[in-house]
Structures are given as C-alpha cells and as structure tokens.
Amino acid sequence: MSEEVGAKRWYAVHTYSGYENKVKKNLEKRVESMNMTEQIFRVVIPEEEETQVKDGKAKKLTKKTFPGYVLVELVMTDESWYVVRNTPGVTGFVGSAGAGSKPNPLLPDEVRFILKQMGMKEKTIDVEVEVGEQVRIKSGPFANQVGEVQEIEADKFKLTVLVDMFGRETPVEVEFDQIEKL
C-alpha cells in the first residue's frame, strides 16, 4: 500500500477506558508545549448524544461511541508517533503490528462515517473573519461574549478571541462554528 509521505491522516489510539477526556486534554497540551502543531492537528473522542427519559423528564447524555479509543489527525513522523505514544493514558496505536512498527491509518470512509455520526464533518468551514475583527461567541462557556480575534489557526479550525473578563482581556480558544461576525 503506497502512502503519501507527509499526508495528514487519522489514527485510532487506544486508551485506558474512562480516560479518553484526560488523554485528549493531555495530548492537546503536549502538542502545544512540544511545538507539534504542524504535525498533530485534531484529537477527537467519538461520542453521540442520547436522550434518556427518567421520572418523566428528558435528559441528554453524551455517550462514548468507542470507549477506550481516541481519534488523532496527524502527519505520521517519528516525532508525532513518539508524542502520541508517550502521552499519559495512551496504551498504543490501533493497527500497529508490534514493537517499533508504525500503525496503519484509518480509511477515509471510516473517518467520514464516524465524524458524520457525531454531527461533525471533515471540516471545511470557511470563516470570513480576520485578526482584529469583533466576533460574538455563540456557544460554550463563553456564549454571548463579544471579543476581538487575536489569532486564527485555520488548520485546527480554531481561533483565539480576546474577551473582557473581570476587567481584563483574556484570550479564549474557540472553534470556528462557535462564533459569528459582528
């Protein structure tokens, strides 16, 4: 199987069950601190929302589709492989044939199916904002806050917005679909 060198691909990573969120957070921190943003792009925990009715009240629950697994979008290099494998809570890559062998990426159709199930797409969001423009955050913990775009990370579909909190400008990282231009 010929594989494009330097291509961004999705890989499944095995974690301790129940540690998926911690692994995602740890890996995202390591990517930033080890300056791997050009090689490791997104970390996704496959989840789906379920509505459960209890005592006559509907309650939305988020359920892990594949407990014990996290998807990582990366360019497979020795460095990116090392960073992911040595993240606390990661037990290994799925599709790795043993010690020292690199794993096989997930098939594009598999990734599209999983992301579609989660209500996500292989992101192709076109954001019409530029650094310095004012935006309103539509969702998340900073919903309805207005701030100035400080940085745009198109490859990660994220941007940094400066919002006023307690009289200070604070940088907040949000995804493209969480903002609207003013």
Swiss-Prot record:
PROSITE patterns xref list: NUSG
Domain of life (superkingdom): Bacteria
Membrane-spanning residues: none
Boundaries of every KOW domain copy: 131-163
Keywords linked to the UniProt accession: Transcription, Transcription antitermination, Transcription regulation, Transcription termination
GO BP annotations, alphabetical order: DNA-templated transcription termination; regulation of DNA-templated transcription elongation; transcription antitermination; transcription elongation-coupled chromatin remodeling
UniProt-listed SUPFAM superfamilies: N-utilization substance G protein NusG, N-terminal domain, Translation proteins SH3-like domain
Coiled-coil features, chain-numbered ranges: none
Gene3D superfamilies referenced in this protein's UniProt entry, alphabetically: 2.30.30.30, NusG, N-terminal domain (3.30.70.940)
InterPro entries: KOW (IPR005824), NGN (IPR047050), NGN-like_dom (IPR006645), NGN_dom_sf (IPR036735), NusG-like (IPR043425), Rib_uL2_dom2 (IPR014722), Transcrpt_antiterm_NusG (IPR001062), Transcrpt_antiterm_NusG_bac_CS (IPR015869)
GO cellular component: cytosol
Function: Participates in transcription elongation, termination and antitermination.
Entry's family note: Belongs to the NusG family.
The protein's name: Transcription termination/antitermination protein NusG
Lineage: Bacteria, Bacillati, Bacillota, Bacilli, Bacillales
